């Protein structure tokens, strides 16, 4: 990789991480009883008083400040592991929530009832952005056993390039490339639909 390209990629990743640290919260504010896996974490701020710009990520319940490359690197650098929180790390890698929302809105007539128990588009987009397992999705979206089976079959179909499970649920032919792409992305970026 050439040096300018490496710098561009590094800058892009740093910008995404800083945006996450500065402006986004993990959790479901505005909803009354989120499941334990989605309990809202305190908003992390860029360069809190006791952190400097070189180490802007403040660990929860600790005076420790981390460099951005230490966040979501597979090792607990914060005492309680807040730098490796599943929802934080999943959300950093996944497509933007607004992109998931736009996708869902375009497919809402067949995808929401068949895969997500007719849940609200905003809620489904947020859950897909942060969920780590099928258990997370099931508990927050109140999925039925049939929804879970449909999600698993649809994801399996997307992974192997077989649209038939989705077409059986009412997916229009023209939607296949977009549906396949998103389901594969979510799966490849950590949404384990086979884990409870």
Curated annotation (Swiss-Prot):
What span is annotated as the signal peptide, if there is one? 1-25
* GO annotation, cellular component aspect: extracellular region
Q: What are the alphabetically sorted keywords of the record?
A: Disulfide bond, Secreted, Signal
Q: Where is the LDL-receptor class A domain?
A: 50-90
Q: Where in the cell is it found?
A: Secreted
List the InterPro entries.
LDL_receptor-like_sf, LDLR_class-A_CS, LDrepeatLR_classA_rpt
Tissues in which the protein is found: Expressed by the venom duct.
Query: What are the disulphide bonds in this sequence?
Result: 51-65, 59-78, 72-89
Q: What is this protein called?
A: Neuropeptide prohormone-4
Q: Which organism is it from?
A: Conus victoriae
* Higher taxonomy: Eukaryota, Metazoa, Spiralia, Lophotrochozoa, Mollusca
């Amino acid at each position: 990789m050439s040096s300018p390209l490496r710098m561009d990629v590094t800058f892009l990743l740093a910008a995404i991480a800083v945006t996450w640290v500065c402006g986004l919260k993990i959790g479901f504010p505005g909803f009354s009883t989120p499941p334990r896996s989605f309990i809202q974490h305190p908003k992390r701020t860029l360069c809190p008083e006791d952190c400097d710009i070189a180490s802007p990520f403040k660990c929860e319940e600790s005076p420790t400040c981390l460099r951005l490359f230490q966040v979501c690197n597979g090792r607990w650098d914060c005492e309680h592991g807040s730098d490796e929180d599943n929802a934080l790390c999943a959300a950093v890698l996944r497509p933007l929530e607004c992109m998931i929302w736009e996708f869902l809105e375009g497919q809402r007539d067949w995808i929401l009832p068949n895969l997500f128990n007719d849940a609200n588009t905003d809620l489904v987009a947020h859950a897909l952005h942060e969920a780590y397992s099928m258990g997370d999705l099931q508990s927050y979206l109140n999925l039925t056993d049939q929804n879970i089976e449909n999600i698993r079959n649809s994801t399996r179909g997307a992974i192997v390039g077989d649209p038939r499970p989705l077409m059986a649920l009412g997916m229009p032919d023209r939607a296949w490339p977009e549906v396949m792409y998103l389901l594969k992305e979510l799966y490849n970026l950590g949404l384990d639909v086979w884990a409870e």
